[in-house]
Regions:
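A ubiquitous short alpha-helical element
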Residues: 1-7, 26, 78-84
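N-terminal interaction modules that seed assembly of large macromolecular complexes
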Residues: 3-4, 12-60
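Hydrophobic faces of stable alpha-helices that mediate helix-helix packing
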Residues: 8-15, 35, 87-95
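Hydrophobic/basic alpha-helical segments enriched in Actinobacteria
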Residues: 15, 32-39, 63, 69-75, ...
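Charged/polar positions within long, soluble alpha-helices
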Residues: 19, 23, 43, 47-54, ...
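Mid-chain, well-packed structural core segment of small domains
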Residues: 68-92
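Amphipathic alpha-helical binding modules
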Residues: 84-136
Length: 136
């Protein structure tokens, strides 16, 4: 029993139940594949739940710095919707700055922007944990 469960813990416990209790009881191969896919979704959601807001706030600051903003706007709260909205605004600022750097031929800034994008893609790949529809 978890006395103070986080979303990550709840999802990981559901994943464990699927793989340790449900999956061994399933005989149909198609259903086994479905259970394995659900397990991947649960584990990915657990990882995202544990870190998503921190990852986005880190990227918000980095994108605004790249864009030359005076400073990232204060996110009104740590509720996911507010952080996602701030992340979207930071992404727009980053995109505009990257377009300007490309148009100006500023290779150093383009490289820095590419590094930021590589970091984002790397984090997304980590988050997806190699997600592909299993067996399909």
């Amino acid at each position: 029993m978890i006395s103070r469960p986080t979303t990550e813990q709840i999802l990981n416990n559901c994943s464990r139940e699927l793989t340790e209790v449900v999956l061994p009881a399933v005989e149909d191969e198609t259903v086994k594949v479905t259970v394995m896919m659900l397990d991947l979704v649960l584990r990915n959601a657990a990882l995202r739940a544990a870190h998503e807001i921190a990852w986005m706030t880190d990227e918000i600051a980095a994108m605004h710095e790249f864009a030359g903003s005076a400073g990232p706007p204060t996110v009104p709260s740590l509720h996911l919707d507010a952080v996602v909205e701030a992340y979207g605004a930071a992404s727009e600022a980053f995109s505009a700055a990257m377009e300007s750097a490309v148009a100006a031929g500023d290779d150093a800034k383009v490289r820095r922007g590419a590094e930021l994008m590589d970091r984002r893609v790397g984090r997304e790949e980590e988050l997806m944990a190699g997600w592909t529809p299993v067996g399909r």
